[in-house]
Swiss-Prot record:
Keyword terms of this UniProt record: Bacterial flagellum, Cell membrane, Chemotaxis, Flagellar rotation, Membrane
InterPro entries with a match to the protein in the record: FliN-like_C, FliN/MopA/SpaO, FliN_T3SS_HrcQb, SpoA-like_sf
A Pfam family matched in the record: FliMN_C
Family from the record: Belongs to the FliN/MopA/SpaO family.
Protein topology in the membrane: Peripheral membrane protein
GO BP term, pick one: bacterial-type flagellum-dependent cell motility
Protein name: Flagellar motor switch protein FliN
């Protein structure tokens, strides 16, 4: 069996394909979500009570800091202090997801010893939601 050496310096991995592929998928997801929201808002079958129940459901919110692809051999070399460089640049907005659906873009903030996200744009599909009950 080959001995694995520990490395603390990793190359920045280039992957131009991910952004192009993700952008297409994101746009299609947004179009599908927008259609669902229009159907939901125009539906006469939804009563006020049903909407109240729906709006009280909790959702998981995830903020994506970035992505990277590494070879398994590089992953096995990870150790304390190893660095993994992401494709995201410092000035790029973070993607905000609700139950794995892209809902907004934001920037990282720090307040009261906690990280947070300041929303800088909301996807058009969310702007059309009728929240009145």
């Amino acid at each position: 069996m080959k001995k694995v050496e520990k490395k603390d310096n990793f190359k920045k991995f280039k992957n131009d394909n991910i952004y192009k592929k993700d952008d297409k998928n994101i746009n299609q997801e947004l179009i599908n979500e927008e259609k669902k929201i229009k159907n939901f808002n125009s539906s006469n079958n939804e009563s006020s009570n049903e909407k109240k129940i729906l709006f009280d459901i909790e959702m998981n919110i995830t903020v994506e800091l970035g992505k990277s692809k590494v070879k398994i051999k590089d992953l096995l070399n990870f150790s304390k202090g190893s660095m993994l460089f992401l494709q995201r640049k410092k000035e790029d907005p973070l993607k905000v997801f609700a139950n794995n659906k892209l809902i907004a873009l934001g920037e990282i903030v720090f307040s009261n010893n906690k990280y947070g996200i300041r929303i800088i744009s909301i996807n058009n599909s969310l702007n059309g939601i009728n929240t009145s009950v």
